[in-house]
């Protein structure tokens, strides 16, 4: 049974526990519907009410939504605020100064607690140091850092100055880092000597040096290095500076620079179907508002909660639900440097038990890998740990299959914790379709219903609504405050990617297929409709991987598709044509390993193909177009039932089938 069939045949319903619902921010479906009705009646008034209630404005806004240059929407445009002030200073003023903001656990298990007062001082010292280096409002700063308090502080320091940050995941290669440095026009890079993952030191500074050596980064005048391990690093005098030295003797107060609500808070790169990563630009006001609203609604955050989002700050989940949302909510959160399987696969459960985590938010891929580990070794099964502090569970990054959902519900939540299966994207800024833990009856594998104010729908290829029970294209019909503003430096690509004329130019295209239940109207996400793969919750463009493969001197041609994978959700499958004869046996295995490592070096380890098949050529139409639908069937091990009448070289299908 396919994953989507499994979800559509799922009829188990789990209602919110009464004790949870009684104290929840949104305690019932009636309360949910009332908020949806409010948004329907007065859309701008709905958003304006929350923006005024929840955020501190240096200059109050008078305009709510400007649609005059759609789809380049503007929210709260004449208002001014500062994201760092809203995350830190307000906590100093409202009695949270000595509350722990971050419980940091290093890879080796060392624990550090940082209060809001201490975090504020750390951020201010770094912001002052950046100012002395000439970094100002509007400058772009790339952050290539390990999971750390310093990584979060670097983001907050940029926001404090009005500098736009662009965080690059520490697992990306020198080439990927260089592309982002060039595209965003960075004037500074903040990195670390090394990062620790699973007991191993990874050389971030060396990769950063390689990236800068590739050229095009002449605007980068300062490289600031956090001393994480004390490992030896290369050094360029006049350019490289230790983070400690930049912050030394700086005052621990720094006035937060007010910026317009539409000022770019950050640019975060995500994979596109055309190969070149897209710089998703987010605003300050609308983004921060939704980060805080979803902390309150989806996570039902309370003053005594201990929140733990296991994402990396290099992804949007780490932006919204580590660097901004929890701090804006005045929450205490866990930040974890390591991996879930070190020193063993009980690490997450051990940390929940030791720290008494109450809200736990992780990826389905992590859950599936931990299920496998727990089944292999009873000693690291979650039932061996005291997880009684948990009151809410969440999933993010990809759809979760009902089987994994049930295991998570029973073995981690002890059948007492609602699960918020959150659908959202880099481009949406925060949750879009998700259960509300005190209100929504849960169905395993379904992300259920859109949040109030989010006008999600399912349409056909012409933009017309499809009836419940019919699959279609997921869209959002009205702009919302946290939405992507543009693709950095490429407004035309923004319009074409997200507001295509084929759908009328007014609907936000999520890029995912979806279906709504006939009876409940619940949404189930069916996967990407474009050439973007979702591997372990990470979006990877097929074109990007193909370009990396073809850059290898041995490769003439390559095509990449996805196939379902029990562990990672989707696995990368590459079909490769060499410039020489097709290898077989041990030679093919050896070459496949070489090409995997090549892709890992070009893009990063997450992009390594799981399967590589060699062929004399690829299945193509007579006009030379690669027939990817046939490759998808081959990758899945399915019989070819599609029409192959336009296929120029039918024999290649059997060859590629045998090549597995």
UniProtKB/Swiss-Prot annotation:
GO cellular component: cytosol
Top-level taxonomic group: Bacteria
Cofactor(s) annotated in UniProt: Mg(2+)
Keywords: Acetylation, ATP-binding, Ligase, Magnesium, Metal-binding, Nucleotide-binding
GO biological process: acetyl-CoA biosynthetic process from acetate
Record carries keyword Iron: no
UniProt PTM comment: Acetylated. Deacetylation by the SIR2-homolog deacetylase activates the enzyme.
Reaction catalyzed: acetate + ATP + CoA = acetyl-CoA + AMP + diphosphate
Biological role stated in the UniProt entry: Catalyzes the conversion of acetate into acetyl-CoA (AcCoA), an essential intermediate at the junction of anabolic and catabolic pathways. AcsA undergoes a two-step reaction. In the first half reaction, AcsA combines acetate with ATP to form acetyl-adenylate (AcAMP) intermediate. In the second half reaction, it can then transfer the acetyl group from AcAMP to the sulfhydryl group of CoA, forming the product AcCoA.
HAMAP family membership: Ac_CoA_synth
Protein name: Acetyl-coenzyme A synthetase
Record organism: Cupriavidus taiwanensis (strain DSM 17343 / BCRC 17206 / CCUG 44338 / CIP 107171 / LMG 19424 / R1)
